Amino acid sequence: MARIAGVNIPTGKRVPIALTYIHGIGSKFADEIVSAVGIEPTRRVNELSDAEVLQIREYIDANLTVEGDLRRETQMNIKRLMDLGSYRGLRHRRGLPVRGQRTHTNARTRKGPAKPIAGKKK
């Protein structure tokens, strides 16, 4: 099992699909990595030599922000918005939708389960 960017890559899958298991690499970047390194996209991970895995690892380290660094960067961006006191930061702080979605109905994923309101019982 190959280990790239701290993630165990599944061995039975094709290389571009296996690379998408790394946080921060989608299908577009996976195809870009495979073509840049010069590996056939139809090859499986268990068919790669150690040198080819090393090439992939070096390309990712040099050109992409992935896994923990990407998560940390995202968290720092959200924290910066909250510290600035911007509208988006306030929405993050309150746990509400950030991008202008309606909240009168819906937004249950962001707001959490519905809280019952005490009313008269029939």
Curated annotation (Swiss-Prot):
Located at the top of the head of the 30S subunit, it contacts several helices of the 16S rRNA. In the 70S ribosome it contacts the 23S rRNA (bridge B1a) and protein L5 of the 50S subunit (bridge B1b), connecting the 2 subunits; these bridges are implicated in subunit movement. Contacts the tRNAs in the A and P-sites. The lineage of its organism: Bacteria, Pseudomonadati, Pseudomonadota, Alphaproteobacteria, Rhodobacterales. This is Small ribosomal subunit protein uS13. Transmembrane segments: none annotated. Residues 92-122 are annotated as: Disordered. Keywords: Ribonucleoprotein, Ribosomal protein, RNA-binding, rRNA-binding, tRNA-binding. One of its GO terms (molecular function) is tRNA binding. The keyword Ribosomal protein applies. It holds the Pfam family Ribosomal_S13. HAMAP family: Ribosomal_uS13. SUPFAM superfamilies: S13-like H2TH domain. PROSITE patterns: RIBOSOMAL_S13_1 (PS00646), RIBOSOMAL_S13_2 (PS50159). The keyword ATP-binding does not apply.
